[in-house]
A protein has these predicted regions:
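C-terminal segments
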Residues: 1-14
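ATP/NTP phosphate-donor binding region
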Residues: 15-104, 378-379
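Short glycine/serine/threonine-rich phosphate/pyrophosphate-binding segments
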Residues: 31-34, 57-60, 87, 112-117, ...
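Glycine/threonine-rich beta-strand-loop-alpha-helix active-site module
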Residues: 88-202
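Carboxylate- and glycine-rich phosphate/diphosphate-binding segment that chelates Mg2+/Mn2+
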Residues: 170-282
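Gly/Pro-rich interdomain helix-loop hinge
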Residues: 297, 304-387, 430-431, 435-438, ...
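Short, amphipathic C-terminal "tail helix"
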Residues: 387-462
Length: 462
């Protein structure tokens, strides 16, 4: 007789972690004191500054170069970073680094400058490294097929943010665009974590309203996604909730009176960095996956792209019985709706049930977006309807393959990502019964989209 023996894998509980830069300096005017360490503690001699042309031409690098001159540290500046940094510009900067041979790299700017500088750092220290290997997706950052090269053997990395949003100054991530394919790749490894972050709001005071708004809402999505992510812990939860409380209170002030309201700027800078530390360890989700591709295909600022997708993702993730969960979560049953309700509670938004609290959270986020001038839909930003629909399938596929998708608490189907994009374009919100999305051809109007969905829903019930 044959014995039918079935084997079931038992999941092991992995060690958790919390990683952050070795040194984080915070306070308006702290830059000169922080940079003192380069000479007095580390004995550094050559610094390479990475920034964009706007910041360079408007004197943002001067406080840094003045301090370096005072300490006798030789320096040069690369200022050709684009708003969406490309692999080509990173290679150009790395070539200049190789010629200059710095022992210190100082990234000054928003996420674009800091991300580009991280890629330059890798290419400078390890020119043999293969970019596509580094961009390879993984399930667990601690158990990768590809081992990231050891960083810091040639240069010490310092990040100085000039806006309150990306959190790149404290994260192990860098987003770079392959200019040949147009694909935006998020790289992730703790070797990319800066050695020092300097959060000096002297660099934030003159940020324009549009940047303040987009960056601030970006920080909101960082904190919300980190709180609901599969790798969230007690350590990241506190940072995420504190960041959200601070942003909801101070972002409108920073937006309206940013050039004079020092307290609002400082609070926002700290909140963005705290949200960065939260998602550096808990990771993000499908909102960022879709925002990466929406920005790459239609040239929307990253924070705006996140703002346009966040409501759809909140509704999608809140399903109590999802068809497919994310992989290797730190919990044993779906509880994302309850997590969103906890965020609503920490913001004192009210509600008697978790469902009511979710609606109040969505309403509060939408009200915050309205206060800082964020529009309601993708279409409102002038994205041509035919161009959007023509690119929709490719954008959907790339979002599905994005590294951030793997940490989302609910694993999406491509059809679900596609419908969320359509909802965000037309301002029609996610309804569970309307999944999966039906194929839509040509230049259609919102009513036609609704008719196709309703027809599909009826046929599914039949």
């Amino acid at each position: 007789h044959l014995i039918n023996i079935k084997t079931v894998a038992e999941r092991r509980e992995n060690m958790l972690w919390f990683r952050a830069p070795e040194k984080i300096y915070i306070k308006k005017g702290c830059l000169p004191v922080a940079l003192d360490e380069l000479k007095n503690v580390m004995g550094k001699k050559r610094a390479f500054i990475v920034t964009d042309s706007f910041l360079y031409q408007n004197g943002y690098t001067k406080p840094i170069t003045d301090k370096l001159d005072e300490m006798g540290i030789v320096h040069t500046t690369f200022f050709n970073v684009e708003p969406d940094p490309t692999l080509a510009s990173a290679k150009e900067g790395a070539a200049q680094m190789t010629a200059f041979q710095p022992d210190t790299i100082i990234a000054l700017g928003g996420g674009s400058a800091m991300d580009a500088a991280k890629i330059m750092w890798v290419l400078y220290e390890h020119p043999e490294a293969d970019f596509m290997d580094m961009a390879m997706r993984f399930i667990d950052i601690r158990k990768r097929v590809y081992t990231f090269p050891k960083m810091g053997e040639k240069a010490y990395f310092i990040a100085v943010p000039t806006s309150a949003g990306t959190g790149s100054e404290v994260t192990p991530f860098a987003v770079i665009t392959d200019e040949k394919s147009g694909v935006k790749y998020p790289l992730a490894d703790y070797e990319l974590l800066p050695d020092m972050a300097i959060i000096d709001t002297d660099f934030h005071m003159s940020a324009p309203k549009g940047l303040t708004a987009a960056s601030g809402i970006d920080a909101v999505t960082h904190a919300v996604e980190a709180y609901a992510a599969m790798l969230a812990t007690d350590y990241t939860d506190g940072l995420a909730k504190q960041a959200l409380q601070t942003i909801f209170e101070y972002l409108p002030r920073a937006y309206e009176n940013g050039q004079t309201d020092v307290e609002a700027r400082e609070k926002m800078a700290n909140a963005a960095t705290m949200a960065g530390m939260a998602f550096a360890n808990a990771f993000l989700g499908v909102c960022h996956s879709m925002a990466h591709k929406l920005g790459a295909f239609h040239h929307l600022p990253h924070g705006v792209a996140n703002a346009l997708m966040i409501e759809e993702v909140l509704r999608f993730n809140a399903a109590e019985a999802p068809a497919k969960m994310g992989t290797f979560s730190q919990y044993d049953h779906p509880h994302t709706l309850a997590r969103y309700a906890e965020i609503a509670d920490c913001l004192n938004l009210g509600g008697n049930t978790d469902e009511e609290k979710l609606e109040n959270l969505i309403k509060a986020i939408n009200e915050l977006k309205a206060k800082v001038g964020i529009k309601d839909t993708i279409k409102d930003y002038g994205i041509d309807e035919k161009a959007f629909l023509d690119n929709l399938d490719e954008m959907t596929e790339q979002a599905f393959d994005d590294q951030c998708t793997g940490a989302n608490p609910r694993y999406p189907l491509m059809s679900e990502i596609k419908q969320m994009y359509l909802n965000a374009y037309y301002g029609k919100h996610f309804v569970e019964a309307e999944m999966p999305a039906k194929e839509i051809e040509g230049n259609v109007k919102a009513d036609a989209v609704k008719a196709v969905y309703n027809k599909g829903k009826k046929s599914n019930r039949a």
